[in-house]
Swiss-Prot record:
One of its GO terms (cellular component) is ribonucleoprotein complex. CDD domains: Ribosomal_L20. It comes from the Bacteria. Gene3D superfamilies: 6.10.160.10, Ribosomal protein L20. SUPFAM superfamilies: Ribosomal protein L20. The lineage of its organism: Bacteria, Bacillati, Bacillota, Bacilli, Lactobacillales. It holds the Pfam family Ribosomal_L20. This is Large ribosomal subunit protein bL20. InterPro entries: Ribosomal_bL20, RIBOSOMAL_L20_CS, Ribosomal_protein_bL20_C. GO terms for molecular function: rRNA binding; structural constituent of ribosome. Keywords: Ribonucleoprotein, Ribosomal protein, RNA-binding, rRNA-binding.
Length: 118
């Protein structure tokens, strides 16, 4: 009897890898070795970028707050310091959302910060 090397187990494993590599360019979605190598790299990128996403959102929020604060005659750092002195306990995500969606409320917050700085 001939020897069966792996058989269904190997086929299932390779099929699983190629299914995960669906949508990759070139031979990376066809050839098992190229696909498994690319999957390894893709998982590394995914892990790294899950961590990076947090700082990228923080940068976006700060940019939005800064732009809105400058329209109201303050810099970002003075705005944040003024809000802290005034006892306004809002995080950057909330402030950025207000700056983006509700200009009147943000202007009121900017006035509060200005009064606290004076």
């Amino acid at each position: 009897m001939p020897r069966v090397k792996g058989g269904t187990v190997t086929r299932a494993r390779r099929k699983k890898v190629l299914k995960l590599a669906k949508g990759y360019r070139g031979s990376k979605h066809v050839q098992f070795k190229a696909a498994s190598t690319q999957l390894f790299v893709s998982y590394k990128y995914a892990f790294r970028d899950r961590k990076k996403r947090k700082s990228e959102f923080r940068r976006l929020w700060i940019a939005r707050i800064n732009a809105a604060a400058r329209q109201n005659g303050l810099s970002y750092s003075k705005m944040m310091h003024g809000l802290k002195l005034a006892g306004v306990d809002m995080n950057r995500k909330m402030l950025a959302d207000i700056a983006y969606n509700d200009e009147k409320t943000f202007a009121a917050l900017a006035e509060t910060a200005k009064k606290a700085l004076a």
